[in-house]
Amino acid sequence: MFLFIIIAVVLLVDQATKAAVQMLMCQGESIPVVPPAFYLTYIMNPGAAFGLLPHKKMLFVTVTVIIIAGVLVGYFKIRPRKPVLDYGLGLVAGGALGNLADRLRYGLVVDFLDFRIWPVFNLADTAIVTGAFLLAWALLNDSDKSSKKERK
């Protein structure tokens, strides 16, 4: 149940921030927040993270559906389930759904977080990366414990 709350919160916050950017900014507009380090820059991204593989909508939709299916399988198969796994799975799925909603609606993804030293991205991207790190940490931490038990 907790997983689905995380997914819903990530999806709602992601879509709300993107809607606000679209209502309040013109495409291509950039607003300094903490110059020169951080700006809000409204772009429509035709590709994946960092603009990779532009205009491959069906590829991204297919991969996203596979990722979400994997999250659900992981959620129901992993026992005992630790909270860090729910957070990781929820962040990845919520972020994936946020970008999927954009792709299905516009054929593009709304991006707006601009640190100038990195390509422009959005909250869904942040959730996906954070969730992936949490999952990797949980799996590595668990494998360390397993290997210590085997050595004893």
UniProtKB/Swiss-Prot annotation:
UniProt keyword annotation of Nucleus present: no
Main location: membrane
Keyword vocabulary terms for this entry: Aspartyl protease, Cell membrane, Hydrolase, Membrane, Protease, Transmembrane, Transmembrane helix
Active site: D111, D125
GO molecular function: aspartic-type endopeptidase activity
Catalytic activity: Release of signal peptides from bacterial membrane prolipoproteins. Hydrolyzes -Xaa-Yaa-Zaa-|-(S,diacylglyceryl)Cys-, in which Xaa is hydrophobic (preferably Leu), and Yaa (Ala or Ser) and Zaa (Gly or Ala) have small, neutral side chains
Signal sequence range: none
Enzyme Commission code: 3.4.23.36
Recorded metabolic or biological pathway in which this protein acts: Protein modification; lipoprotein biosynthesis (signal peptide cleavage)
Cellular component GO terms held in the UniProt record: plasma membrane
InterPro entries xrefs: Peptidase_A8
Enzyme class: hydrolase
Subcellular location: Cell membrane
Its membrane topology: Multi-pass membrane protein
Bilayer-crossing regions: 33-53, 58-78, 83-102, 120-140
GO terms (BP aspect): proteolysis
Annotated NCBIfam families: lspA
Entry similarity comment: Belongs to the peptidase A8 family.
Function: This protein specifically catalyzes the removal of signal peptides from prolipoproteins.
PANTHER family: LIPOPROTEIN SIGNAL PEPTIDASE
Identification of the protein by name: Lipoprotein signal peptidase
Organism: Pelotomaculum thermopropionicum (strain DSM 13744 / JCM 10971 / SI)
Encoding gene per record: lspA
